[in-house]
Amino acid sequence: LKPDFTPDYDLIAQKAPGAKVCHIQRSRGYTQRNAFDLATIQKVADTARKANPNAVIFVDNCYGEFTQTAEPVAFGADIMAGSFIKNPGGGIAPTGGYIVGRKDLVELCAYRLNAPGLGKELGCTLETPRDMYLGFYYAPGVVCEAIKTAIYAQCMLELLGKKPIPRYCEAHNDIVTCFDAGTAEALIGFCQGIQAASPVDSYAAPEPSPEPGYTDEVIMASGSFTQGSTIELSCDGPLREPYTCYLQGGLNFAASRAGVLLAVQNAYFKD
């Protein structure tokens, strides 16, 4: 990516020859950028494929499912994957993930997961298919609630002088909102407010702590029915300047709105 977090198409074309996979992460991770829209994914795929027709275009679609009326496999991706404890599980699926795309590539993934030649015909399901299918059925509506929550939070944060990404009036290509909390105390207070408004473990007060894979301490708030679920209202952020907070999820707008209000109050109006 360029310093402004847009794809460097010249560098992509330079690096593509000889590469087996072009990996596109749709959502932002711990960076301050918008999620890639479908047109950008298409352009990255076209650039890589022109430089290397044999490259597999893979999209990590986490947080992006059902935010638009189409998915990356319709915009240049050969294969994509995501998690059922995020958007496509609808807050109901307790575990799992999905892989979708070209049949030959999906079969190769199944062979690697289970056994060559047996693929998806083998393997345990942990008695979860019903919940997975039910969650997937509800997922588009749940994602709509999460986006409504994001837009509400973005409006609220702008009234406080913050600069959320994305803005309420911009296209939403994932369910995440990030903004600079300004201070460590505000970041911690916001996360603790989200936790206090959660339906599970609302009595807990999250604190920053070291996390494997991160260079800074991280604070995470998630009072969710499913451990690790981020389609449920949650937020987190690394304890480093400018103390960026990442807010996502919301199974229903009514409860999530209360969570946003409590988080803002706890971060900026404690006195």
What are these regions (language model features)?
Residues 158-270:
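Conserved C-terminal alpha-helix-loop-beta "cap" of PLP-dependent enzymes
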Residues 1-137, 143-144, 148, 157, ...:
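Conserved PLP-enzyme active-site core in the AAT-like
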Residues 98, 142, 179-183:
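Generic alpha-helical structural element
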